Amino acid sequence: EEAMSLSHKIAVMSRGRLEQYGSPEEIYSRPATEFVAGFVGKPRMNLFTAEPLERGLVAVPGTGLKVDLELPELREKIRIGLRPSECHVVSASEEAAAGRVAVIEPLGAYSDVIVDIGGGELFVARESGFPEVRVGDHVTIDLRDAVRHVFDIETGLRRG
């Protein structure tokens, strides 16, 4: 956080290796690797393994989460990243829900809503103010405003 606010350029390293060098905006908006994506930003980026369904639509196995990536040629598993600040929760029926609200962390100007999406996976959405949903509510996750960050499952490198 401090480096993001004070620096013109940042070097992100892992295990003695340079992962990415760039401006705070470049590193936050276009992380070069999955490591950088998970390291920069609070709360951390939601990162999941996903597999292709049809024409750019991917699903996180064992969960109700499906994401349109607009990558029709995708045929293999990938890692997908979604920033909590770009995702929102919406009340839903049990049948239509992607998950259930597990925890709400009210932090004043915003609240972190932690959703159990099944398969042992948790999804964090950052809502402004105090959310209308409650713990135990069934919800869908609105990804309309979310930038989709796609990483190679083997190398961790950004795709596209």
What positions do the PLM features span?
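Residues within helix-turn-helix
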Residues: E1
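Hydrophobic Walker B segment
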Residues: M4-S7, F39
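Short, glycine/charged-rich "phosphate-handling" switch motifs in NTP-dependent
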Residues: K9, Y21, R30
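Catalytic metal- and UDP-sugar-binding loop of GT-A-like glycosyltransferases, i.e.
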Residues: V12-M13, L82
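Short acidic-hydrophobic catalytic motif
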Residues: E25-S29, A37
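Non-catalytic connector elements of ABC transporters
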Residues: P43-L47, L53-G160
